[in-house]
UniProtKB/Swiss-Prot annotation:
Pfam family, one: GHMP_kinases_N
GO terms assigned for molecular function: ATP binding; homoserine kinase activity
Entry's Gene Ontology BP terms: homoserine metabolic process; threonine biosynthetic process
Known EC number: 2.7.1.39
Known pathway: Amino-acid biosynthesis; L-threonine biosynthesis; L-threonine from L-aspartate: step 4/5
Protein name as annotated: Homoserine kinase
Phylogenetic placement of the source organism: Eukaryota, Fungi, Dikarya, Ascomycota, Saccharomycotina
Family: Belongs to the GHMP kinase family. Homoserine kinase subfamily.
SUPFAM superfamilies named among the record's database cross-references: GHMP Kinase, C-terminal domain, Ribosomal protein S5 domain 2-like
Length: 357
């Protein structure tokens, strides 16, 4: 049999843009890449599902196909379509420059890559809406997922589903991605979901973006889990705070398209009262950064916010990138936190699949 090879690229993403908590996301030109080779002459029997993994990039990840997020996700898609294992001789090399647990959508990129991988392995020919359904069964916040899958500047929401469909979309994640410990399956076999996801779990819209606006990310050198970051949020909000964000999100989605960009309007419309103030205690220096980094003191700055659940800071700017980055890094340094910075453009193509010749 001939050797098959293909490559899947998925951009990083930044969610919760300004007032757009759980709504707005952008794809960024920092790519998770997986290179898949299927060569029947290679012995892959050492893996329970015949997929050998290799990895280079940020952090450490599991190499067993039933524990790695990318291959777990692919196995879920395949299982829902009657496919148990990868083809014998499957090798998957993961190259991941996206920092783990920093608010740049590393898990969303992995999930999107896994869904695309399952689609290719099974030759399922799923369209983007159906691919999104599979993604949202695992990552139930569409802002990162839609941005990673589609690229660009995206708004999204979850549709209201029937009670039956809602039950399926809210099952414990261990039923979707079975939990394994020391090679042993922990999730009860009869609980593992093999039913295809409901149709149209989420909806998205693609906004325009002024390409003069660049994305400067300042990335602190510590991880912050989304679960921990969400745990500090209130269960109920005050109406004035909700209205505050609604007013700004209505302006921001248009302001980011206008040319020339109105820096002051974008800056004011990127303010938030729904999540950032509650996360100050988890990210030393965040409050100072938001107070000190303004268009008045940094010409070229359009807006600033927490990227996703943090701790990364997202600065939208047209100029003055080096000074902005250096001063944000210095604020964190005073808190004993080292940072890296990356200047990125939007990734407009989203996730892609390319076959070798």
């Amino acid at each position: 049999m001939s050797v098959i090879s293909f490559k899947i690229k998925v951009p990083a993403s930044s969610a919760n843009i300004g007032p757009g908590f759980d709504v707005l996301g952008i794809g960024l030109q920092l790519y998770l890449t997986i290179t898949v080779t299927i060569d029947p002459s290679i012995d892959t029997s050492s893996d329970p599902h015949h997929a050998l993994l290799s990895y280079e990039g940020d952090g450490k990840v599991p190499f067993e196909s039933n524990e790695n997020l990318i291959t777990q996700t692919a196995l879920y898609v395949m299982r829902c379509n009657g496919i148990k294992d990868f083809p014998r001789g499957t090798h998957i090399h993961v190259n991941n420059p996206i920092p783990l647990g920093r608010g740049l959508g590393s898990s969303a990129s992995a999930i999107v890559a896994g869904v695309y991988l399952g689609n290719e392995i099974g030759n399922l020919k799923l369209d983007k809406y159906r691919l999104l359904d599979y993604c949202l069964m695992i990552e139930r916040h569409p802002d990162n997922i839609a941005a990673a899958m589609l690229g660009g500047f995206i708004g999204s929401y979850l549709n209201e589903l029937s009670s039956e469909d809602s039950q399926l979309t809210t099952v414990p994640l261990d039923y979707i991605l079975p939990k394994v410990k020391n090679g042993e399956l922990i999730t009860p076999q009869d609980k593992i979901v093999s039913q295809q996801p409901p149709n149209n779990i989420g909806q998205y819209v693609e906004y325009k973006w002024n390409k003069k606006i660049k994305c400067l990310t300042i990335i602190p050198n510590f991880e912050l889990s989304t679960d921990l970051s969400r745990s500090v949020l209130p269960k109920n909000y005050q109406l004035p705070d909700i209205v505050y964000n609604l007013q700004r999100i209505a302006i921001l989605t248009t302001a980011l398209t206008q040319d020339p960009p109105n820096h002051k309007v974008i800056y004011q419309s990127m303010k938030d009262k729904l999540h950032q103030p509650y996360r100050f205690g988890l990210i030393p220096g965040l409050n100072t950064v938001l107070q000190k980094i303004t268009p008045e003191s940094y010409p070229g700055l359009c807006g600033i916010c927490l990227s996703g659940a943090g701790p990364t800071i997202l600065c939208l700017a047209t100029d003055g990138f080096e000074k902005i980055a250096n001063d944000v890094i210095e604020i964190f340094k005073q808190e004993g936190i080292e940072c890296d910075s990356k200047l990125l453009d939007l990734a407009y193509d989203g996730a892609t699949v390319e076959y070798g010749s």
